[in-house]
């Protein structure tokens, strides 16, 4: 109550922020006549002037009014488009590390040019982030003329681009790309083996389009760079065969309950669990398939991986549906994004789930992958010094943006008042009744010439509606992941009079639906159109546009509520753009997933009490409230999951930052010999301490064990026992010094053979490879730890604290292993004298000649022989071949230098 009174007096925080920013809008407007007087050359020279002022210490914020005025005037000259005052407000919000909520059709793409230009003046690079490659390319090409007019370079970062092209894109003042590609480039840069391989600069300013889609919907999706693990495709196929024998466990209070089934399903948590009866049957079937021995338990330690395969196969069959969660195209299982309905080419589910789905669909099973590097979007985008974003629907997630990303959400007012009519939801008992009602509504409205957009939550549902429309004889277009290539054309014409378009999740589509259709699309189909043709097309469009407005504008039909209110609002937001007329309504049934899982019992009882008849809909505030509560429940649960994910990932993030910092320092120096010497001292001290405890009696020393360890791990022959027998006066400290000095002498002799430069490069290479290998193993160990850490709760321990404690111990152990393995590898490497290499090469040539004379071998036998032992190589050592000394370097960079 008190807060409401205070808000009325002082205004909300949103109002106060906009009031402050409007003062700057007035300043920019006053500068407009001055900018109009400037010639093109004088306007373009402003960029250099601003940069000079920044170098002299002027703050970026002080330049804002002038810079925005320059962009506004340049846009008028280049595009013939003037930034509205609300777009200037949006630009200021984006410059202040905030989220700007701007409704669909308010010109977010043009708004982004303002903060992008201002922050590009620093020369530190601006990253504009979009949800897909099409939008990245479109926005970059659309805005390129403006930025180039102002003297700024524009780069596009697309998947599959070679490193030099990516480096050039990142070197540009403003770079457009997708969230995935920016994240993957960051990971790849931190796997590089030379500074030249890196493509990104230091992360400065990210401007994220559809920020809710990227920072919230995809927050649970980690970016993973992986390498192939062992092939277990046969096991997936065998396990897949047993799943159809299992029966689902029904609820005990349901009509179909007939005793215990083999597995139960928790739809809320998306989990499947075997029952006792199911476990017995699975074990019997696995024994029958010859996968498991008679009498073995699926839960025994030796069968943990087998249990993992069974769970993955069960989830693939029960929780993942074709044309909902994925599609099968050209013999490949492609994931469908649950939020946008787009296919995610190249993405794969982890933990063997993707292979299980491939086995279920009987397509080629690709090998499982092992994680080499990974990061979540939450942690990647928090690496930027400055982060901002824009979307049409952010206010419902304002708390999450604030608590996780420290970003405030500011709702920017529309340029014209919103007049769309949002009609109350209609709820039916069955799915079929709901579909019938939707078809009737479409018939009535399309006859009047009103365009209709039908939003569905999956490809499967879009095809159900499509079939019903075909049956009713209503012409329509379908926009889903299966017709991805036709997207731009379908959306461009969705606003035509009487057009019916079915779309799977309009979130992140990035294209406005213009009433009367898109006249620009018509012009684009003409070859070299003249001004007269363009004028005719515009005039015809104006007539169509007015007719559609008279019919009521674009009507939105939602076929069911999404888990998130924000996705529903995005669908609604496609109508009523820029003050146009429009309407929206959601049709629901008690068989919808959201209603069935979260709101079914209460609403079903309510509908029964109201005496519902078949085909009759309920339209009541109670029902709307129950649905809103169900959505809030899901949103709250999803937020908790994302928050928990972040808390766990923050532990890995700190370790990742430490490893990547150390790795980059390694890359940037050419000589790490001092580091190697320091590590060697630590390793030998620790090793000797294990066998000769400090300040201990000689009787406690294990000299034989130490000799064996030095031989096995460091290739050092040291007769320690003989030294002690021969020199009774040899005490502990002197012995330690002798062991270390002899190890150092052996290493220096190797260095003399290959040369200082080769050894420095080799040390660096060994350090990087060992670090990468151990980091990869550490990531896998962290995954395993995380999967089972929740069980610590049963022992009255906090799983998060346990995870932090254990992961820190694992990290410390990994760093110790790094030191040990680096010194062990460097000690074991065999180097050869130049004359030995010549003798070896002569021997290889003779062997090759002998093999060439044996003509009786078939080609196949010859091939198998040549790919066998290296001693049977049939050609001289090439300059790019591995050096025979075992250093791992190319011959030309190692002993090949000595042959010159």
UniProtKB/Swiss-Prot annotation:
It holds the Pfam family SecA_PP_bind. It is found in: Cell inner membrane; Cytoplasm. InterPro entries: Helicase_ATP-bd (IPR014001), Helicase_C-like (IPR001650), P-loop_NTPase (IPR027417), SEC_C_motif (IPR004027), SecA (IPR000185), SecA_CS (IPR020937), SecA_DEAD (IPR011115), SecA_motor_DEAD (IPR014018). May bind 1 zinc ion per subunit. Its main location: membrane. One of its GO terms (biological process) is protein transport by the Sec complex. It comes from the Bacteria. One of its GO terms (molecular function) is protein-exporting ATPase activity. Its EC number is 7.4.2.8. Keywords: ATP-binding, Cell inner membrane, Cell membrane, Cytoplasm, Membrane, Metal-binding, Nucleotide-binding, Protein transport, Translocase, Translocation, Transport, Zinc. Residues 889-900 have a biased composition (Basic residues). Monomer and homodimer. Part of the essential Sec protein translocation apparatus which comprises SecA, SecYEG and auxiliary proteins SecDF-YajC and YidC. PANTHER family: CHLOROPLAST PROTEIN-TRANSPORTING ATPASE, SECA INNER MEMBRANE COMPONENT OF SEC PROTEIN SECRETION SYSTEM. Part of the Sec protein translocase complex. Interacts with the SecYEG preprotein conducting channel. Has a central role in coupling the hydrolysis of ATP to the transfer of proteins into and across the cell membrane, serving both as a receptor for the preprotein-SecB complex and as an ATP-driven molecular motor driving the stepwise translocation of polypeptide chains across the membrane. This is Protein translocase subunit SecA. It comes from Pectobacterium atrosepticum (strain SCRI 1043 / ATCC BAA-672). The gene is secA.
